[in-house]
């Protein structure tokens, strides 16, 4: 039984160590240790309703702290990986610079390996222009589709076209052409299947 109180003292010392750490050095294990210490101290205060409400708030704060620590750890790991990749790239460039002809490029220049299948094929400005044009065309298509739907449902009257014909007549004419094409297709398929109409 004496072993148990000694263990609690050791836990308390470890947990206080987690509280003494810099926020940037915290790990999720440290957050769990802090949570354990705070929970143990709240239990010692008793079962007052105010303590219970405070306990729920502390749990929420600990969850937020855990999330922040996890995100920070991920960001640090990503930066380490990027640093390692850059070191490898610099080392490769140094070896290539020693073995091949030295090319001195400015800070805004980039060397592109034409044999690399993942090389950039467009500038960022070209991509932006293409995306803007695509978005513009999408919005125009949506407007035309809405207008067509309104004409079909009868919400909008047909407009006069410059040739003096109404658009509805033009739409009907296109519909008739479609029907003729469909009947031709039906005849073709019925002929192939052995049915003659």
Curated annotation (Swiss-Prot):
Family: Belongs to the RILPL family.
Annotated Gene Ontology cellular component terms: centrosome; cilium; cytosol; intracellular membrane-bounded organelle; membrane
Segments of skewed composition (Acidic residues): 8-17
Main location, first listed in the record: cytoplasm
Name recorded for this polypeptide: RILP-like protein 2
Transmembrane intervals: none
Effect of residue 59 to Q: Loss of interaction with MYO5A
